[in-house]
Amino acid sequence: MNLTPTTPVDDDNTEPGPFIELSRESWAVLSDSTEIDIDEATLDHIRGLGDPTSHRDVVEVYRPLTQLIHLYCMHTGALFDASNNFLQLTRHGMKRTPFVIGIAGSVAVGKSTVARLLRELLGRSPRRPVVDLVTTDGFLYPNRVLEERELLSRKGFPESYDRKALLRFVVDVKSGMPEVTAPVYSHVTYDIVPNQQLVVRQPDILIIEGLNVLQPPRRRSSGTMGLALSDFFDFSVYVDAEEADIIRWYINRFLTLRQTAFTDPHSFFGEYARMPDNEAITIAKEIWDTINGPNLVQNVLPTRGRATAILHKGPDHEVRNVWIRKV
């Protein structure tokens, strides 16, 4: 794991730092603390395209992570109750607001699979909480707006999102609004779906997955600092890997999509389905070099140190190390 000096994780662990590093083997031992599990059929449904996440990964990596998040959730609830008692708000019947989890990481690193796995596993934890999942793709500006602003070639960069709408969505959720809506995005048409909305109705846990969810606050024109999405997270996960591995996974996924989603007559990328493999690989590399790669280096990777947990994957897509922020 190549960590820059500015990242608050120590490569050699010889100096005290804000993170605890655990090898996969050490982390897997913690799996015995819970019996939460899923079957192969459910895992098949959850896995992303080309993602080789196995049942062994579920047991050794995601089960301990689920238990850790459950502990955070329980203690957050206890703190909420204690604070209400101290402030004498109990008589007002204030309801606890959703526990919000952010999942960040590069394109093609497998963060969507991690988000879906956690939704399934957390929903099976004690007390059977209601768990919703929202991706930030729905808060991308429609292609029409991106074209008007000459941002279509920067889709996925922070400025391509309606950040005010996304922040308002999370603020409303954390404020206890009974019903909050989010736009819906189609990976087939590569655009926002008109007249469709995802409705979130006070779940116990809300998972928000996206490239830039751990971005720090921006400075307003007045010079004051604004709010960041991550200000409202109770727990966050960064899915990490070496860029060379992510590029390879991205190209392989691109080639697979040519035989699946790209063949849909409504697909925005239909022309790629008819290309020879060598041309498709060239296009995929170009997209990475001009969009996904620069976005990773400039915007996504620098937020890694802001996460509560970092899952670092090896070349085979398996999590090799886990970093947990010290409480």
Swiss-Prot record:
Reaction catalysis annotation: (R)-pantothenate + ATP = (R)-4'-phosphopantothenate + ADP + H(+)
GO molecular function: ATP binding; pantothenate kinase activity
GO-annotated cellular components: cytoplasm
Origin: domain of life: Bacteria
Compartmental location: Cytoplasm
CDD domains in UniProt: PanK
Binding locations of ATP: G105, S106, V107, A108, V109, G110, K111, S112
UniProt cross-references to SUPFAM superfamilies, sorted A to Z: P-loop containing nucleoside triphosphate hydrolases
Keywords: ATP-binding, Coenzyme A biosynthesis, Cytoplasm, Kinase, Nucleotide-binding, Transferase
EC numbers, comma separated: 2.7.1.33
InterPro entries: P-loop_NTPase (IPR027417), PanK (IPR004566), PRK/URK (IPR006083)
Claim: Cytoplasm is one of the keywords in the record: yes
GO biological process terms, semicolon-separated: coenzyme A biosynthetic process
Pathway given in the UniProt record: Cofactor biosynthesis; coenzyme A biosynthesis; CoA from (R)-pantothenate: step 1/5
HAMAP family reported for this sequence: Pantothen_kinase_1
PANTHER family: URIDINE KINASE
Similarity remark: Belongs to the prokaryotic pantothenate kinase family.
Protein name (record): Pantothenate kinase
Gene expressing this chain: coaA
